[in-house]
Amino acid sequence: MNIDDLKRCLNDIKYEDLEKLKEIILSKDKIIILGNGGSNAISSHIAQDYTKALGKKGLSFSDASRLTCYMNDYGIEKAYCKFIEHFAEPDTLVILISSSGNSDNIVNSAEYCVDKHDMIILSGFDKNNKLNSYSDKSLLSFWVDSKEYGVVESIHEIILHSLM
């Protein structure tokens, strides 16, 4: 991981956005956090921290049995949409994380949430990634200006941990 890149990306985070994130998270009772790979690990970690430290109903989609069932029955591209459909309530906040911003299942989840659920999106790599195109339809959007997975994932976790 390039430490200079990490420092630069940390400095790019706006304090006002972290304050807005805190306000949004504290105003919600149920929060679903979704990601793939390393972002899924972040989702699981943050969901349990929001439950333990903040008393929120934090959910991630990381149970292997349920995840593979949904992927088999609905296809990987729609599995997360179905998870949201089955577990979200009208006022549920959905946080979508994709380092590249181009994971079809995460992008499809953003499309699904439009007009149904409030969402926060976190992405990286190319600013014109597919997920970032939903930033105007989300309550808040964080884009990390790096093409390194380690940097993007670290910044995403720092952002989501910032209100703890």
What is the meaning of each model-derived region?
Residues 7-8, 15-16, 33, 70:
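Short secondary-structure boundary micro-motifs
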Residues 5, 20-24, 42-49:
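Residue-level detector of alpha-helical secondary structure
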Residues 1-10:
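Helix-enriched interaction subdomains in cytosolic or periplasmic regions
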Residues 33-164:
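Glycine-rich phosphate-binding loops that contact phosphosugars or nucleotide phosphates
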Residues 9-28:
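A short, well-structured juxtamembrane/interface segment
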